[in-house]
Amino acid sequence: LYSKDGQSYFIVDGHTHFWDGSPANQLNRYGEGFVKCFYDYHTNLSPYEYRWTLEEFERFPEERMIYDLFESGYDDVAVLQSTYLTDWFVNGFNTTAQNGDIAARHPGRFIVNGRWDPRDGEAGLDKLERLQERWQLKGVMLYTAEWKGDSKGWKLSDPWAYRYLEKCRELGIVNIHVHKGPTVYPMNRDAFDVADVDDAATAFPGLRFIVEHVGLPRLEDFCWIATQEPNVYGGLAMAMPFLHSRPRYFAQIMGELVYWLGADRLLFGSDYAIWQPKWLVEKFVDFQIPVDMQGEYGVLTPAMKRKILGLNAARLYDLKVPGELDVA
């Protein structure tokens, strides 16, 4: 728990990674460029004292992650999002098996999310079933702009994507996290377009679509979709660090999200190791919409922040919350 000014917050970090971006694992220049693009986000949007060297960033030890999330940081539970990118990384960037191994060594700390790619066809459906059997998945992380051979992306509205979403429904994998945010080199911007979420959310009302990075830079598109689709949620990873570098921009983002979605469908995420939960949580709890913007956006109350920082994600993943905080 994080406590400040008599208020306590249960923290569920909805977006973390334990990756291997080391040169030895980079398959080609695209893998190298992908890591360096992540690193640019890290250095440009982090407070100086939290910046790492590129070498530290490419591959960090398990012990450092545990310290940053749970000892120095305030995470009570963290969601490990699997990102394969096997066209660019020899052993994948961070796979379900790699994430599952670290979760097994730290019981109660992590939720492991799987991954699928509709371009894998029938074989991929079988693999998803095996992943579910092994890790009891409640969620997956999807990268619609991931490259595969000559293909540079896919859509949630594709016929094969529907097959996989139907399989998720059948297996009880109800939390569908989708990267719909800033482009990452060398991926294509349009392959991250949020528009296909509208189609899938309508077709699969029993699934929850967590739009990671809230569609940035297409925030308005995301908000107009989410306001009419009650099973669409906003993952705040990537939006959160603007607390430090662009606080008024962050106020605008939060104001729009709360106006259109309310506080019940927004999920905190650090996107570790790009950013660290310690300073994000501290700054978010201290943050308030500037006075001159409150006439349009209102204020963020401690109750709203509690939902965003952990209670909403706890509800999606059936996590036990300390009794005094269980108001969801």
Task: Report the location of each language-model feature.
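Short active-site segment of divalent metal-dependent hydrolases/proteases
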Residues: 18-19, 182, 216, 274
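Divalent metal-dependent hydrolysis catalytic cores, especially in the metallo-beta-lactamase
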Residues: 36-58, 67-88, 109-115, 138-139
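Alpha-helical scaffolding within the catalytic cores
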Residues: 60-67, 95-100, 124-128, 194-197, ...
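Mid-to-C-terminal alpha-helical segments outside catalytic/metal-binding sites
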Residues: 1-14, 21-69, 126-130, 260-265, ...
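Histidine-centered divalent metal-coordination motifs
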Residues: 15-21, 179, 213
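Conserved, mostly hydrophobic/aromatic
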Residues: 15, 103, 112, 131, ...
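Catalytic pocket-lining loop regions of alpha/beta-barrel enzymes
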Residues: 27-28, 138-139, 151-268, 296-300, ...
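Active-site gating/metal-coordination segments in enzymes
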Residues: 77-191, 323
